[in-house]
From Swiss-Prot:
Acetylation listed as a keyword: no
PANTHER family, per database record: IRON-SULFUR CLUSTER CO-CHAPERONE PROTEIN HSCB (PTHR14021:SF15)
Annotated ranges, domain J: 2-74
Described function: Co-chaperone involved in the maturation of iron-sulfur cluster-containing proteins. Seems to help targeting proteins to be folded toward HscA.
GO function term, MF aspect, one: protein-folding chaperone binding
Family: Belongs to the HscB family.
Protein's name in the database: Co-chaperone protein HscB homolog
Signal peptide feature range: none
Gene: hscB
Length: 174
């Protein structure tokens, strides 16, 4: 299913999330199972299925990584259940540096400053990746779609690393 069509958007990485939320509420009102309480069982089931599609579409389009994955899946590139790893040596080196910095936080003289520095580093790198991804996703070239898939893999890794950093920060606050 093309969630961009469902929510009446042109496929694009940058979308108006406020408009997405508005259209989500409209679709929810239109397909909500309560509207079909007095209809046939088939209509009720169809309503439940449509509600699930609307919910999944909203969750997909509101999350930038899932939105990019969806855009790529519409072009025949499935990333959601893959195990392909990033082969970019520069990114792998950066990844190792971040992991080392993450491990060193507990022994740091100023753990919060180390955490803040990592968050800043993540934000800067993520902004670069996102800018490149936006450009690649607008291209119709097959090789650009493959490069976009690599950017998504990197962003997924960074999201996991960000979650780890948040857990370390939470543990230090406890």
């Amino acid at each position: 299913m093309n969630y961009f069509e469902l929510f009446k958007f042109s496929p694009a990485f940058d979308i108006d999330t406020a408009l997405l939320a508005e259209r989500y509420r409209e679709l929810q009102r239109a397909v909500h199972p309560d509207k079909f309480a007095n209809d046939t069982e088939q209509q009720k089931l169809l309503s439940v299925q449509r509600t699930a599609q609307v919910n999944d579409g909203f969750q997909t389009l509101k999350d930038p990584i899932r939105r990019a994955e969806h855009m790529l899946s519409l072009r025949g590139i499935e990333l959601s259940h893959e195990t392909t790893t990033v082969k970019d040596t520069g990114f792998l080196m950066q990844q190792m540096e971040w992991r080392e910095a993450l491990e060193d936080i507990r022994d740091s003289a100023d753990p919060q400053a180390s955490i803040d520095a990592l968050y800043q580093s993540f934000a800067e790198y993520r902004a670069q990746l996102t800018q490149q991804l936006t450009q690649l996703l607008t291209s119709e070239q097959a090789e650009d779609a493959l490069l976009a898939a690599d950017q998504v893999r990197k962003l997924k890794f960074m999201a996991k690393l960000h979650d780890e950093l948040t857990r370390v920060e939470d543990a230090l606050l406890d």
